[in-house]
Swiss-Prot record:
Gene, per the UniProt record: atpC
Top-level taxon: Bacteria
Subunit structure and binding partners: F-type ATPases have 2 components, CF(1) - the catalytic core - and CF(0) - the membrane proton channel. CF(1) has five subunits: alpha(3), beta(3), gamma(1), delta(1), epsilon(1). CF(0) has three main subunits: a, b and c.
Protein's name in the database: ATP synthase epsilon chain
Organism: Lactiplantibacillus plantarum (strain ATCC BAA-793 / NCIMB 8826 / WCFS1) (Lactobacillus plantarum)
HAMAP family listed in its UniProt record: ATP_synth_epsil_bac (MF_00530)
GO terms assigned for molecular function: ATP binding; proton-transporting ATP synthase activity, rotational mechanism
One matching Pfam family: ATP-synt_DE
SUPFAM superfamilies for the chain: Epsilon subunit of F1F0-ATP synthase C-terminal domain, Epsilon subunit of F1F0-ATP synthase N-terminal domain
Taxonomic lineage from the root: Bacteria, Bacillati, Bacillota, Bacilli, Lactobacillales
PANTHER family (UniProt xref): ATP SYNTHASE DELTA/EPSILON CHAIN, ATP SYNTHASE EPSILON CHAIN, CHLOROPLASTIC
Compartment(s) where it occurs, according to its Swiss-Prot or TrEMBL record: Cell membrane
Similarity comment text for this entry: Belongs to the ATPase epsilon chain family.
CC terms in the record's Gene Ontology section: plasma membrane; proton-transporting ATP synthase complex
Amino acid sequence: MADNAKSLTVSIVTPDGQVYENKTPMLIVRTIDGELGILPNHIPVIASLAIDEVRIKQLESDQEDDEIAVNGGFVEFSNNTATIVADSAERQNDIDVARAENARKRAETRIQNAQQKHDDAELARAQVALRRAMNRLNVARH
């Protein structure tokens, strides 16, 4: 059993339900202002998350880190509990690489079409879709 002073609890939830919950010695997230590492007893924080991977260190050093593709949302940390509320999130082993690759190709096509039509709103949506697809692919391939 992990010593509470040496670990924190991480919970990741989406509109579809809980994706992840575990204890960790360190959580690493990318906020809109840059990377943030959270250790036990960190000061309370709330931050908006970028579309990127969340890395959760394992209590046992010989185990691989858990990696989760998170597509926006926020992290709130207090009392040694980190709660990530994400628009969507997928654990590394749950990512369908073929589906993510198809999403990447569709997004690239949408970007080209939006640029040709000078449709700024569609271009912005397509760029977000591309970032989400690339995030899923990057996490799946680690």
